[in-house]
Amino acid sequence: MDSTQLARGIVRELLELGISDVVLSPGSRNAPLSVALYEVAKKGFIDLHVRIDERGAAFFALGLAKASDNYVAVVCTSGTAAANYHPAVLEAHHAHNKLLVITADRPARLRGTGANQTTNQVNIYGDVKSHDVAAPIAIAPLLAGGPVHLNVQFDEPLLPTDTNDWLDGLEIEMAADLPELEGELHVSEGTVVIIGHDRGTFEADLIIDALLAADLPVIAEDPLSFPGAIPHAALFLADEKVREKLRPTTAVVIGRTTLSRSINALIASAEKIV
């Protein structure tokens, strides 16, 4: 399969998964993806955000993923471009954000030969799940809530030689529903709820309904992810005297708390952590 067909297959997968935002850092080796993405953007199937600087592009995509709680794809060319995505991918990994990183690569046969802009990009992001792709691949089974890396091998020629309407017969596949909260929330006096960045993959509305019924104080490590939380909690909890006065008997933690030392200190001070 040539590079044009491979790129079109990947982009079609993105559309069928319902991914609506793609951030593109254009380059030479990812030209097949750039052309395919432009074609679907022109038809209104995606919002294509072009960002030349790779580091900024990756963080922009991360922001979109956090705000939408949906997978956002970010696409770059080979070599050092892929390395410039690493800071944002690392943050997405620890916060469990939905980032689909697609890096273009030379064919595997050129690795270790000194070819221009060629390095070992497989597993370049450490513990993030990485898939070396030389043929069409089903992306849906790979998406488990955190960042995923597709390293796609493109051989020359990199530009399309046909004008086929490859978007005919497109079917949009709805994303799987997030888990629901089951049962009632029974709490005692002195209970506080702390919500991490990913909300434990639960929908915000489900958490809000449960907490309103229980009438509990709520602290969110990322205030943007939960508007009903106590504002500026991380700031006033930095005062040890305030933290001691507010020490909970039970801390109910939903999701992962990774950034705020003061909030983690409050959790650690609780008599019981759930």
Task: Tell me what each language-model feature is.
Residues 75-77, 98-105, 149-153, 194-196, ...:
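Short beta-strand segments
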Residues 8-19, 64-69, 139-144, 182-191, ...:
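Glycine-rich phosphate/diphosphate-binding loops that line cofactor/substrate pockets in enzymes
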